[in-house]
From Swiss-Prot:
Active-site residues annotated for this sequence: K167, H286
Keywords on record: Bacterial microcompartment, Calvin cycle, Carbon dioxide fixation, Carboxysome, Lyase, Magnesium, Metal-binding, Monooxygenase, Oxidoreductase, Photorespiration, Photosynthesis
Binding residues annotated for substrate, in chain numbering: N115, T165, K169, R287, H319, S371
GO CC list: carboxysome
Highest taxon of source: Bacteria
Main enzyme class: lyase
A GO biological process held by the record: reductive pentose-phosphate cycle
Keyword Lyase on entry: yes
Record Gene3D superfamilies: Ribulose bisphosphate carboxylase, large subunit, C-terminal domain, RuBisCO large subunit, N-terminal domain
Extra facts: The basic functional RuBisCO is composed of a large chain homodimer in a 'head-to-tail' conformation. In form I RuBisCO this homodimer is arranged in a barrel-like tetramer with the small subunits forming a tetrameric 'cap' on each end of the 'barrel'.
Reaction catalysis annotation: 2 (2R)-3-phosphoglycerate + 2 H(+) = D-ribulose 1,5-bisphosphate + CO2 + H2O; D-ribulose 1,5-bisphosphate + O2 = 2-phosphoglycolate + (2R)-3-phosphoglycerate + 2 H(+)
Protein name per its UniProtKB record: Ribulose bisphosphate carboxylase large chain
Role according to the record: RuBisCO catalyzes two reactions: the carboxylation of D-ribulose 1,5-bisphosphate, the primary event in carbon dioxide fixation, as well as the oxidative fragmentation of the pentose substrate in the photorespiration process. Both reactions occur simultaneously and in competition at the same active site.
Gene: cbbL
Amino acid sequence: MSKKYDAGVKEYRDTYWTPDYVPLDTDLLACFKCTGQEGVPKEEVAAAVAAESSTGTWSTVWSELLTDLDFYKGRCYRIEDVPGDKESFYAFIAYPLDLFEEGSITNVLTSLVGNVFGFKALRHLRLEDIRFPMAFIKSCYGPPNGIQVERDRMNKYGRPLLGCTIKPKLGLSGKNYGRVVYECLRGGLDFTKDDENINSQPFQRWQNRFEFVAEAIKLSEQETGERKGHYLNVTANTPEEMYERAEFAKELGMPIIMHDFITGGFTANTGLSKWCRKNGMLLHIHRAMHAVIDRHPKHGIHFRVLAKCLRLSGGDQLHTGTVVGKLEGDRQTTLGYIDQLRESFVPEDRSRGNFFDQDWGSMPGVFAVASGGIHVWHMPALVAIFGDDSVLQFGGGTHGHPWGSAAGAAANRVALEACVKARNAGREIEKESRDILMEAGKHSPELAIALETWKEIKFEFDTVDKLDVQN
């Protein structure tokens, strides 16, 4: 045995804490928020994360001599305090790109958020951000279509797109489900949507739903002269079943399908995205289960990481929360990961939670979807926050209209167009929101009733997961 080999256990920081290291452009960089066990030095905790998420194990092993460990190991190169948190700290780790399979988000996450999250030396661990190098981005397929192609295909420009989730989301027969879709689309919406948990249940098998939805879309297109769509959820118990459903949607002439990317998994999502690109279909992505992973401020994976991974894995639309609705998410954090979905370059900006510069090159962008507890009074804020390259989805805010879903859809369409017109005229639509909506309501009885119905409805709860920024 080589004389270089010394059996036994040594501290992680002897090998994986490298404060003099300067990251390479080709390195994959990660920022972890670490909370170690009492008495364990920060450097040892951070080095343990670097080791266990790359080449390390608990003991020195002879087979290290068979490879170039210094080339392949992850390196913790910086530690920072977390503002306002004396228990936790940020560990910045650089990983050589050769540790990861090209184009595989599954492989990246298996390393970075694998066994290390169960490590006893850690009380909590959270993956806050990843900087993907351009060499890795170029190996990923990304969105099957992107923002501009979707606009061209749907022939919709100059404003956010408008949609809603069909309610009740479970329990309707296929025919009644199609009836609700028709009412919404003829009322003025661009899209309707399956909810995340409707697949193929006894009360409504997927073929039946797809057929009645297709009929509803064709009728509404004939009546309105506009291109319409419905997110047909093809998420299934096996990939083979998922592709069968996608093929049937294509046969029916539908423009868009849907996938629950976290419960379905990144491998399934990447495969479906490739299928959509090949077959000319748009792909809507729901983030069901995300809050289990991202809501705890000290443990899990931040949603900005999931959003980045989804852009690389592939999707044309992704749910991002609303800021003003019923779901978790403050304004600056939400804007931070919306930038990661849509922009070609996003600079480091701690005020938005972005720990690294991120160059996306020529990869197409993803529509940000605002959905969850929103109604017409929220429209000015939504237009201001999300901008044009977004989908604003009003579920209860459509179906809960006293005159029915068609009237709710009409109210939302009038409110949206009034806000876009006011914005284009240079008005501050958030400050002047009441005047803008009340004026539009004078010419739309549907909007006037909606404004009266939801005038007292607010979701004013403090955000659980807040940005760690210095005051």
